[in-house]
Each structure stands twice: as structure tokens, then as C-alpha cells.
Amino acid sequence: MKFDNVIIMTDIDGTLVTDEKKILDKDMKAIERFRSGGGTFTLATGRGYSMAKPIAERIGLDVPAVIFNGSAVYDFSADKFLWHSGLDSYAETVAKELIEAFPDIAIEILCEDKVYVPSINRIERAHLALESVQPILCSVDEIHEESWLKMLIAYPPENIHRIIDFVQSRPEYVSCAHWVRSENHYYEMLPIGVNKGSGFQRLLEIMGRKDAFTVGVGDYNNDIELIRDAKLGVAVASAQQAAKDAADLIVCDNNSGAISEVIEYIEKL
């Protein structure tokens, strides 16, 4: 298949980057070959603007990307949001009640260009250090933003089911948001109807590329809609079973050159 009508949208963590948060040379070379052949390569990530920017710069991203797990479409080359959706105002109450119920919880509120952390733990500290993010440590009441794009919860993986059960047992929580587990230690609150698949569709509309051959690549539960809704859905070998079940194709893991394998597969179609 020629690349000129193909759009690849890939997850970052666990898919594009290795476990050490690096992009393999073989993947970079494949991306460059794909783009030189007319293909469009972009990102769909749970990361916010500041956390996704280093990866966007590393790959020389020249088209918009989906960030905040589908809550926004961002143009890194123009440094501006093209579209975004915010959480229901009830999210503020949810955050306060979670902190009260679980004093050892970490909560991260992601807004357009700021990251607020009203409650922190060791998992969140490690996450912020790894991503070189400077958060604003403050109470929920001190966050004066018009729109929260998403709320991330960090909790030990062996106990995160307690958070999930707490949320799912409260109809008022479930009815006001889309909840998804994005890593074994992360649980996220997103706007209703928002996911990476809906974000991909929004990006295609913005770009005027609704007829493109779409390829979605991912590894975790927050990638399921991206994988399922693409014309070619791809999961890496290290993916969660639910992501694999949604896929048309399984490639090698994120430490072995998954993206280069995807591009080689497309070439042979």
C-alpha cells in the first residue's frame, strides 16, 4: 500500500516509547520513511501538553495530535489547542471526596497548560520526576481554572481496585464522566463521550481527512476505542488482553520496534 492516504495514530507510553521512555532508532527511521512516502504520523496520548511536547519534538510532529486521552486536539507546530472538552463541574466534588476517603491517594488535575496536584504519593512523585513536570501543589479549592481536561488518579496497583470500586458504586460519579484505567496504577476521569477513538475522529474532521486509511496503535484499556475504530487496529505484544481483543494485528512489544513493524506491514498491504 502507498502511504499517501494513510494516517497512523499511536499511543506513546507502552507503545511508541520503550520502558525507558526512549524511541528506538529503528522506529524513528521507519517513521521518517513513512512520512517521506507521503504518510501522516501522529500521536494519541493520555499525556497533557507539557508531558507530550518532548516526544512531539523528538519525532518532529508536523500535524495535530490527540492529548489528554481524547479531551483535546493540539497543534504542537502552532503551539495551540484546536479543540478541547472539559470535565463536568462535579469533578471538583469528586476530587475532594476521593481525597477524604483515601488520604494516601494522588490526584492530578490536568488543564490546558498546567498540572495541579492537590494530593500526592510516591507513585505520583516518581511520575512527575520521570516526565520532568513542574506541578502546582495546592488544594482543590485553590484551582481556579475554567476547564479541567482530565483528572488522573495514581494509587498502588495492588490496591487500586478499592478506588475503582468506590467510584463505580456511586451513580453520581459514573453518570458525570467516562472512567478508564490507563495503567496498572492509574485510573482516569474524562469528559463523557471522550476517548482516544473519539479524539481521532475529531482530528480527522479538523484535518479534512475523513476518508483516510486510519491505523490506531496502542497497548492499554484507554487505547481500545482507538484500536477498534481504526481501519487497521494494532496492539503491541505487551498489550492488555482487552486491547489485543480489539485489534486486527498484533506486533512485537514496545521495546522491540513495534512501530517499524506496523509500517512494514502497511507497506505489504
Model regions and ranges:
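Mg2+-dependent phosphoryl-transfer enzymes with acidic/Ser/Thr/Gly-rich catalytic loops
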Residues: K2-I7, L24, E188-L269
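Active-site metal-binding loops of divalent metal-dependent hydrolases
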Residues: I12, R47, G218-Y220
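Short, structured coil segments at secondary-structure junctions
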Residues: I59-L61, N69, S77, S175, ...
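Short active-site oxyanion
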Residues: G38-T42, D62-V63, L149-K150, A212-T214, ...
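Conserved acidic, metal-coordinating active-site core of Asp-based
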Residues: D104-V217, N221, L226
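Generic N-terminal amphipathic, Lys/Arg-enriched alpha-helix
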Residues: M9-V17
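Hydrophobic packing residues within well-ordered alpha-helices of enzyme cores
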Residues: D27, A52-A56, I163, V167, ...
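Active-site phosphate-binding/coordination module
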Residues: E20-E124
